Every structure is written in structure tokens, then in C-alpha cells.
């Protein structure tokens, strides 16, 4: 099978996904074959690559958006177990986060499942208290949690399992009429980092996301309401993460807005020499801006102020807002 990755270029002929990034050429990718640059791709794919993406939560996808991470959990990898979700969400919104992603179950490597009732108890009060400050998404794998979160004011469901964990979640999303983010993960948090393996991680994740989209569409969720996330750090080694990030523009070929979540991830600490998760904001921003250069629309981060500032300077220097 052939895959065509748009190669971002400042003076490119076409706009990527109707946004700020441009391209004129493609990298032709095939399993077991060396990549090569080509000047043409199938017309249907070109139309998909250039079509503007639908708004998400009322936000245009023609510019990068900041999603702030709100941990309503006592065991998140990044905050050392100290949390106040409502206060955290207010700080993120004030700092420039346009979406607040509220989660009540840690999905860090090795984390154990949280009972549904406990997860609901954690997220619903936080969502209710943040309603009106920014758009709200709920980070959950469970249908019951999503239903309660939607009733409290969540406008998007962010499922790290891509409907693998709870098949009933697809029906909840379909009936709600809300958008959903489908992430790729190999395995579950308890075991996903034990020994992840792929034939070709970039292409395997592409195919897996395509299958998740097809399953969502079959459940009654149109592609226009789907966001995709390649799942950096979820069942992937450092080498896997880097392989995806170097060519992440490939995923625009799936016809959905793309979300990138790299904030404070272990590979940033490993490469950047930052053992403590909270010390990884500079590395996070570097990877985030690399994703922006490849047209990635939504960036899920802990540090909204640093990201807002970085994006403002990126726009000023590159003309990325034109």
C-alpha cells in the first residue's frame, strides 16, 4: 500500500487542511521501501489534504489551538499527586487555554483503572465549575463517565482508547451529537510500555486510526466530528515516538483535525536531560512547535502560558497567521 505524506514548505502551492502550513510535494511511503519525494498524489487524497477542517468546539482549525490539561486525579505523572482541578482549570484558561481537558483517571504508564463511580465523582464537579471559562472536553474511556460529563457541560469526549476500552462509548457520543477525539494506544495503561512493537510504527498507527474512524462512522459519528491523536507515549518507545513526530503530517490524509499530546512526556526528559516532569516545559514547547510546523491543529499541554507565548512568537517570525 502507498501512503503520501505532504511535505510542509513555506512557499508551497497548497494549504494543508485549509490552515497555515503549505506544501507542494509528497513523500511516498511504503512498507519495506525507502521513502522518496514525488510531485503528485491521487486527486481524492489531495482534496482531503487541502480541505479545511470543520470547527471543533466552535474553534476554527485554521490556526493552532491550546488544550489545557486539567487533572482531577491524585496520581497524575506530571504533578506529583498534588491537584485541585477547578483551580488548575481557571489558571489554564486565564493563561490562554481555549479548551480544558478534564480527566479523572490517570493514563500514565502503569496506572490502574479507576472505578466508574469514582471517576464521575472526580470530573463532574470540576467540569461544572469551569463551564463558561473555556470549551470543555472530558478525558475518559467510559460511557457512563462521558454521559455524566456531557450533562455537566463537556462538549467533546477525548478517549485515549479510541473506543477499544468501552464499546458503549461510541453510542453515547453518537447520540450526543458532540465531537470525539480518538487516540491510538497499543495496550492499556497498566501494561502498554512493557514491550511495544510495530512493523512500521508510522504506517501501523495510520492504519489503526483509519480503522477507528471507520468504526466511529459505522456507529453514527460523521468524520466531521472526529479528531485523531497518534498517541505519543501510549504503547510506544522513544524511537517510535520520534518516528511519528518526524512525519506526523502524514495523518492529515485521514481527513480529520489532529491533536498532539507530548506535554512533559518521558522521552522529552530523556533527550532533554530533565528527570522531573515539571522541568520539561522547554522541551515540550520545542516539540509542540515542530508539530505546528507540520500543520497539527490542537496541542494538549500542561503549560498554557508558555505555549501561548511560543505560538505568538512563532506566528510573528514565520508569518504563520497569514
Stretches found by the model and what they are:
Residues 32-60:
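Non-catalytic propeptide/linker segments at domain boundaries
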Residues 62-66:
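A short, charged/proline- and glycine-enriched loop
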Residues 222-225:
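Short acidic capping loops at alpha-helix termini that bridge into adjacent secondary structure
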Residues 1-20, 30, 61, 76-91, ...:
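Active-site-adjacent loop and "lid" segments of alpha/beta metabolic enzymes
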Amino acid at each position: 500500500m502507498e501512503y503520501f505524506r505532504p511535505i510542509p514548505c513555506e512557499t508551497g502551492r497548497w494549504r494543508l487542511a485549509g490552515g497555515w502550513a503549505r506544501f507542494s510535494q509528497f513523500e511516498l511511503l511504503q512498507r519495506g521501501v525507502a521513502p522518496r519525494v514525488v510531485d503528485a498524489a491521487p486527486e481524492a487524497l489531495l482534496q482531503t489534504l487541502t480541505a479545511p477542517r470543520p470547527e471543533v468546539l466552535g474553534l476554527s482549525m485554521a490556526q493552532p489551538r491550546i488544550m489545557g490539561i486539567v487533572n482531577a486525579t491524585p496520581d497524575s505523572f506530571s504533578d506529583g499527586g498534588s491537584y485541585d482541578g477547578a483551580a488548575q482549570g481557571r489558571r489554564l484558561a486565564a493563561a490562554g487555554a481555549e479548551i480544558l481537558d478534564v480527566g479523572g483517571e490517570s493514563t500514565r504508564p502503569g496506572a490502574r483503572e479507576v472505578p466508574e463511580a469514582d471517576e464521575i465523582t472526580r470530573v463532574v464537579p470540576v467540569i461544572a465549575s469551569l463551564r463558561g471559562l473555556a470549551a470543555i472536553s472530558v478525558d475518559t474511556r467510559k460511557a457512563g463517565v462521558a454521559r455524566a460529563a456531557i450533562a455537566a457541560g463537556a462538549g467533546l469526549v477525548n478517549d485515549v482508547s479510541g473506543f477499544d476500552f468501552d464499546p458503549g462509548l461510541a453510542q453515547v457520543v453518537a447520540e450526543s451529537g458532540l465531537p470525539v477525539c480518538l487516540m491510538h494506544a497499543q495496550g492499556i495503561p497498566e501494561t502498554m510500555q512493557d514491550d511495544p512493537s510495530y512493523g512500521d510504527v508510522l504506517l501501523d498507527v495510520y492504519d489503526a486510526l483509519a480503522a477507528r474512524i471507520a468504526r466511529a462512522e459505522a456507529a453514527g459519528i460523521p468524520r466531521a466530528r472526529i479528531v485523531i491523536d497518534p498517541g505519543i507515549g501510549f504503547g510506544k518507545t522513544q524511537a517510535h515516538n520520534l518516528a511519528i513526530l518526524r512525519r506526523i503530517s502524514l495523518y492529515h490524509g485521514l481527513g480529520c483535525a489532529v491533536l498532539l499530546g507530548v506535554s512533559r512526556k518521558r522521552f522529552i526528559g530523556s533527550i532533554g536531560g530533565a528527570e522531573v516532569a515539571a522541568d520539561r516545559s522547554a522541551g515540550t514547547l520545542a516539540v509542540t512547535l515542530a508539530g505546528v510546523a507540520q500543520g497539527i491543529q490542537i496541542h494538549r499541554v500542561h503549560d498554557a502560558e508558555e505555549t501561548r507565548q511560543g505560538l505568538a512568537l512563532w506566528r510573528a517570525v514565520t508569518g504563520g497567521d497569514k
